[in-house]
Amino acid sequence: MASTTVAGQNSDVRIEVISQPEDFTQVTEVVRDAFGHQARDGVYLSMNPGWDTPEGVVRGAGRMANRFTTVSKNNKGEPNAVFLKATVPDPENAGQRRIVGMAIWAQQSAIEGHGDQPPKDLIKELGLESIFPGNEAEQRYAAACMGSLHKRREEVIAEKATAAEPAVFVLDMCAVDPKFQGKGIAKKLVQWGLDEAKRRGGLELLLEASSMGRHVYSKLGFKQEGPEIEYDVEEQFAHRDRPSNIFMRTGDGQ
């Protein structure tokens, strides 16, 4: 029987800030297995052509590593994006650890110096021209999906521009290897963000929740705001599958 903490969670799980780009191959495999093989998330599948091939993993890891190496800092010197990994002892390699969960937390704000500003050109910011070279329709579709997904997030960021604390802390992505789900790993990744937001001055936390993740988020104090997120896409793409997502937030002063 694995050792557990008093809370009943597996004590072999470690949550650590990623410090080397080499980790992103395993991180990308976790995302692939959770969003691709398990959830069949339509937006993930469309934005990651070849996601289930070795080449697709290399491309995905490269994009994540590029974001990692270009992280900006706020006016307090804190990174505006933090990449987390959850590791457990590798069952196939004694003495080594294996990445089985990941999260990206981002500080965002409409005010310079208080966090990354929401992107003005999604095709450029997401590198969609390199993902879909010469295919403007697919570039527009991916941008429309992400723009719709983050619409309420960006409205809240704009609303906070005149607040005493104009920044928010956003869960940009969270995934756990399907073989290691149900062990409290997602909860630990989210709790790290709650603690970090408090350390950064009590920032409000925002996220877009899939059907799989929302029960974890609600237990940790996130509340749904508004109805299901609607995707505003061109008619030619209306038939495509897109995942259920809702906008959730903690409220001010967390």
List where the protein language model places each region.
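A short beta-loop-alpha structural element at the N-terminal edge
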Residues: 14-41
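Conserved acetyl-CoA-binding loop-helix of GNAT-fold acetyltransferases
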Residues: 176, 182-195, 219
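Active-site rim helix/loop that mediates acceptor-substrate recognition in acyltransferases
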Residues: 45-83, 87-94, 158
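Residue-level recognition of the GNAT/N-acetyltransferase active site
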Residues: 177, 210
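Conserved GNAT-family N-acetyltransferase fold
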Residues: 84, 103, 174, 207, ...
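Conserved active-site alpha-helix within GNAT-family acetyltransferase domains
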Residues: 187, 199-200, 211-231
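Conserved GNAT acetyl-CoA-binding A-motif
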Residues: 169, 197-209
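Conserved acyl-donor/pantetheine-binding loop and adjacent beta-alpha core of acyl/acetyltransferases
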Residues: 71-75, 93-175, 181, 229-241, ...
